[in-house]
Structure formats: C-alpha cells, structure tokens
Swiss-Prot record:
Domain of life, source organism: Eukaryota
Segments on the Mitochondrial matrix side according to the record's topology features: 1-34, 79-106, 177-196
Name listed for the protein in its UniProt record: Transmembrane protein 126A
Keyword Transmembrane: yes
Keywords, alphabetical: Membrane, Mitochondrion, Mitochondrion inner membrane, Transmembrane, Transmembrane helix
Localization annotation: Mitochondrion inner membrane
Family: Belongs to the TMEM126 family.
Gene (UniProt): Tmem126a
Length: 196
C-alpha cells in the first residue's frame, strides 16, 4: 500500500478554500461576487441602446427598430459580461489577482473600453448600414468617409460622455467592492467540521 500524502499544492488549497469561504458570506455579498459581471453587462447594454438611439436620430433612420436595437443590447452585454468575468471576477476567485489597485484598474479598463466605448463604436456600422439601406441620410463619397463619420459621431460622443464615465466609475467601484468582499470572506473563521 502506498502512503497517501495530503495535497499541499497551492492551487488545490486555493480552489478548495476560496469557494468554501465565499459560501459563508451573506447572500447579498455572495450575489455581488458571483453576478457582478452581469451588472456591468447590463449597463453596457443600456449604453448600446442609448448610442443606437442617438445615431438613429442623427441619421434619420426610422425603420428596423428591433433589427438595430437587438444587437446593440445583446452584443455589448455579452462582451462586457464575459470580459469582466474573465479579467476581474475569475482571477479574484481563483487567487490569481490579489491586489486591490490591480482589481480596480482592471475593472475600470473593462468598464471604460468594453462598457462605454465599444457600444458607441458598434452603433456606427449598425446604423450606417441602415442609413445606406433605407437611404434616410446622404452618405459621403469615397474620399471623405472618415471625416464624415467623425463629424456624425462627435455629438454622440459628447452625449455619451456621462453614461461612459458612469459605467467606468461603476466598474471601478465593483472591482474594489469584490476585492474587499473576497478579503472579508477569507478572514471568516473556518466552519466547524464534524468528525464522523
């Protein structure tokens, strides 16, 4: 018979300890740790719908409301949700991210780039394609396409400044809060294990 040594591998310990400690947290704190990325995704979806609406008004697009609103809500939601989960929540819960500033910075970057800027940039080709298809707005000739879209996009970026900053601040706060909740969970005493 082989002597069976207990696993002292750091990864095994972390994968066993962190989920067990998180289960000891109150339900509201546990939900924030587990579903925080969905909140970031929902904010990104709302940002996508707002950007879609602003571009539709500027380009005078009145047809295909659902055809443009559906991808402008679903794609930013999925992108921001999965990115925040991959870059912030998952590394936190596996012990690969152990610095509050790092967590806040990652959350801020995901919130700004994928929750704020990405929905605005995604709205440009969606609504540009609809404007070309329904001929609701005169589109530029080949030489000045870039200048045309910059001119069209400036008012949208100005109006989307507050939602983008709000998304960025919320993602930074959520990253910091998730880190503090994880530290709180790790400081909880070990539950009494009954020996049978």
């Amino acid at each position: 018979m082989e002597s069976h040594k207990p696993s002292t591998n750091k990864d095994d310990l972390i994968f066993n300890i962190i989920p067990r400690k998180i289960k000891q947290l109150p339900e509201s704190d546990r939900n924030l740790l587990e579903y925080g990325s969905a909140y970031i995704g929902l904010n990104a979806a709302f940002g996508g719908l707002i950007a879609n609406s602003l571009f539709r008004r500027i380009l005078n697009v009145t047809q295909a409301r659902v055809a443009s609103s559906l991808p402008m809500a679903v794609i930013p939601f999925l992108t921001a949700n999965l990115s925040y989960h991959s870059f912030v929540s998952l590394p936190l819960s596996t012990g690969n991210l152990n610095c509050e500033i790092c967590t806040t910075t990652r959350g801020t970057l995901v919130g700004f780039v994928l929750g704020g800027l990405y929905p605005i940039l995604l709205a440009i080709p969606v609504n540009g394609g609809l404007a070309a298809r329904y001929e609701s707005s005169p589109l530029p000739q080949r030489g000045n396409i870039f200048n045309y879209w910059i001119t069209i996009s400036k008012p949208v970026f100005r109006k989307m400044l507050f939602p983008t900053l709000l998304q960025t601040a919320f993602a930074a706060y959520l990253g910091s809060r998730q880190y503090k909740l994880l530290i709180k969970a790790l400081q909880l005493p070990e539950p009494d294990l009954e020996i049978q």
